[in-house]
From Swiss-Prot:
Gene source species: Pseudomonas putida (strain ATCC 700007 / DSM 6899 / JCM 31910 / BCRC 17059 / LMG 24140 / F1)
Residues engaged in binding S-adenosyl-L-methionine: Y40, G65, A66, S67, D90, N91, D122, I123, N137, R204
Catalytic reactions of this protein: prephenate + S-adenosyl-L-methionine = carboxy-S-adenosyl-L-methionine + 3-phenylpyruvate + H2O
Gene Ontology terms describing biological process: tRNA wobble uridine modification
Protein name: Carboxy-S-adenosyl-L-methionine synthase
InterPro entries in alphabetical order: CmoA (IPR005271), Methyltransf_25 (IPR041698), SAM-dependent_MTases_sf (IPR029063)
Protein family (similarity comment): Belongs to the class I-like SAM-binding methyltransferase superfamily. Cx-SAM synthase family.
Function statement: Catalyzes the conversion of S-adenosyl-L-methionine (SAM) to carboxy-S-adenosyl-L-methionine (Cx-SAM).
Domain of life: Bacteria
One Pfam family, short name: Methyltransf_25
């Protein structure tokens, strides 16, 4: 996977456009997300480990918002249930093209990987097959808030008994002091990873109208409203967390 450094916002922009997952972002995405999301490599690797516990023979495993395929590859490496296949979905044509290239290259490096089908599609309109695992890694926060419950409800209906939804998201906090502290700590994380104040400010301007994070409590309440019986937080680093939701 490309290691091109993220310099997208390093020069002053007269007008900062809304963030989109286009070819420019795709080229630098691995570097961008590693330097922007604390704990990201840990989440990705362990998504495969978690999925192996819930995967059932002959079922689909979904990676919704697959981007360049890191989570998909983690699922393929760790899950050993017979007859499983991964369905990786993203609505960005640039992401899908590079995802396919990456996964094809992985096929030549690893043996006994699960088969994968990469789709360019809108997950809001996607008909789900019966599934034992659904992974949404920093995807729901880019869905319009008023469409999130309906999507989660459809995912819940597709999940088989004993399956799981693994949902990773950036969090906001109802407590103002906690929100301010964790926001500043996240900015410190970005600074420590080499982002300038200009880059941080312009990226924030680009993404604030596109990404709408929720509180942990909102996620838990919505998941229960969608029909999930249990919601278990399994990871948090600063204002980024991952949850296991059980049907």
């Amino acid at each position: 996977m490309s290691k091109q450094p993220d310099r997208l916002f390093s020069q002053p922009l007269e007008q900062v456009p809304d963030f989109v997952f286009n070819e420019d972002v795709v080229r630098v995405f691995p570097d961008m997300i590693k330097r922007s999301v604390p704990g990201y490599p840990t989440i990705v690797e362990n998504l495969g480990v978690l999925a192996a516990r819930f995967a059932q023979p002959g079922t689909a495993l979904y990676d919704l918002g697959a981007s360049l395929g890191a989570v998909t590859q983690s699922l393929r490496r760790h899950v050993r249930s017979d007859g499983c296949r991964v369905i990786a979905v993203d609505n960005s044509a640039a992401m899908v093209e590079r995802c396919r290239q990456y996964l094809t290259a992985q096929d030549s490096m690893f043996q006994e990987l699960l088969p994968v089908h990469v789709l360019e599609a809108d997950i809001l309109a996607l008909p789900f097959e019966p599934a034992s695992v659904v992974a949404m890694n920093f995807t729901l926060q880019f869905i319009a808030p008023d469409q999130r419950l309906e999507l989660l409800g459809r995912i819940r209906q597709a999940l088989l008994p004993g399956g799981a939804l693994i949902l990773s998201e950036k969090l906001r906090f109802a407590d103002e002091q906690a929100q301010d502290l964790l926001n500043e700590l996240h900015l410190d994380f970005k600074r420590a990873n080499g982002y300038s104040e200009l880059e941080i400010a312009q990226k924030r301007s680009a993404i604030e109208n596109v990404m709408k994070p929720d509180t942990l409590e909102t996620h838990q309440e919505r998941l229960r409203a969608a029909g999930f019986s249990k919601v278990v937080p399994w990871f948090q680093c600063l204002n980024f967390a991952s949850l296991i939701a059980l049907p």
